[in-house]
Amino acid sequence: MSDNVGLSTPRGSGTSGYVQRNLAHFRPRDNYQSYPPKDFDSLKHQPRQPDKGLLEHDRKREVEVKVFELRDKLEEEGVEEDEIETRCDELRRKLLAEMERNQNSRGAPTGPRKNLKMHQVHELADAKIKESERLRQALKISRDYQEGSHWKKQEERLKGALEREANGDSSSMPPPPAPSGPSGGNDRGGDRDRGRGRGFGRRDRDEGRLNSRERRAPPRDWDRPPTPRGRGGRGGRGGRDREVDSYRGAAGRDRSRSRSPIRERSRTRSPVRDTGRSRSPVSERSLSRSRSRSRSYSRSRSPPRRRAADSQDRSLSRSRSRSYSRSPDRDRYREKYRDRDNRD
């Protein structure tokens, strides 16, 4: 062991006696402060302050560079050493005085900032501070102004209002606005009445639409035979089918309205069917059959009747469907077999 470090002898210590510095040990910093500091809000909007010692060193270095240039020039000219020293001292004093003057003057130009490089951090920070100072003087902003202080005042005002409200001090709070309008405090009732009026208006509108549709439906001439149309015809379904569909759509809204005109028509049409049956010619019989076919088809497509309908209407519809359910194909086949039997 050397320099009285460690044990007096390595004997019995289990070590070789070699002493070295602990490389993992870090000395605590002087004037150590935790981050972020307590006054972080005040420091947040301040620009980075340059190191004044480094800036002073750079300025003195520029002065010494100019002094050495003068010395080299005088030595080349062959001037004596004493004369060179005196001239260099005069130039140094002159440049230092000029530097002090520029440093003390606040509105002085910052120098060739455009020649500063990115690694000259302290020089750039100093130039930025001087530029901000000139801008503050031009806009007449006070020195103690802090950026964002206006928002801070608003936050403090809002916080005070919330604290007063929590403490129950409602005397300083403005009174709530009085309800406007003739109804006064009965606004809820007015809104309810308005909602009811809206519902009634919609219902009246639907009923008016139904009535207008019934009015627009053209009256059908039951004495005239319907035009025959096949299944693959151009028109698809006939006008009677469209009318039935429209009544069926209207029945979803108001079933009692949509079914009443159909019943009245079926009752008024009964004498026409009786007269058609009493006629003897074949043409009239086929006409009545085609009529019955279209009517039975429309009846099958009509909307379902109510359960509480009259028994007379039910029996009437059943008898009609039984009497007119014969198709023209069956009649044709029967006539053909009849002719064949007559021939035999």
UniProtKB/Swiss-Prot annotation:
Instruction: List the Pfam families.
Output: cwf21
Annotated segments matching region Disordered? 1-58, 98-344
Chief place where the protein resides: cytoplasm
What name has this protein been given in UniProt? Answer: Pre-mRNA-splicing factor cwc-21
Of which family is this protein a member?
Belongs to the CWC21 family.
Entry GO CC: cytoplasm; nucleus; spliceosomal complex
> Where does the record place it?
Cytoplasm; Nucleus
Q: Does the keyword Nucleus apply?
A: yes
Q: Among the record's GO biological process terms, what is one?
A: mRNA processing
Q: Where is the composition biased (Basic residues)?
A: 288-306
Q: Which source organism does the UniProt entry give?
A: Neurospora crassa (strain ATCC 24698 / 74-OR23-1A / CBS 708.71 / DSM 1257 / FGSC 987)
